[in-house]
Amino acid sequence: IVLIFDEILVGFRLARGGAQEFFGVRADMVTYGKTLGGGLPVGVVCGRADLMRRYREDRPADICLARGTFNAHPYVMAAMKAFLDRLETQPIKALYRGLDHCWDERADRFNRRLHERGLPVRIAHLSSIWTVLYSRPSRYNWMLQFYLRAHGLALSHRGTGRLLFSLDCSDADFEAVLDRFV
């Protein structure tokens, strides 16, 4: 059985080593997306050598080639290298220190404000990945995304109620989101 982590969404939001580091589990294969390319369009599949081999043992000349217009695009490769190099710098390491505490505190503050205002919405989160949950069913819940858009906020994933924060979201930026949401 091969354990595959899909980190297209989670990427490096939880830890410098991704979800594998955060959960203390080593996957056999991992996928990454635009985070690794600094926002540029990229998809990466990596894993154990035996799973990533491009040929068959019984037919070594039968090489698998993947062709595409943007494969190994120089801008994307440079952005990926810059991202990976920066992961090793002290400012980035410092950004990850205390990350859970920071986002736990912010989620608690957000939920308190929602509760104080009597709104039927709560936030569940994993670090800076937030999901908006309704505390009671209503045929009007879908309208929240349009209200938020009118106030300059967009839920990701076509209305599934996901808020994705940048790791360097300042306290002032967070307060602005909270004020607009509530």
Name each region found by the language model.
Residues I1-V182:
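Conserved N-terminal phosphate-binding loop of PLP-dependent enzymes in the Aspartate aminotransferase
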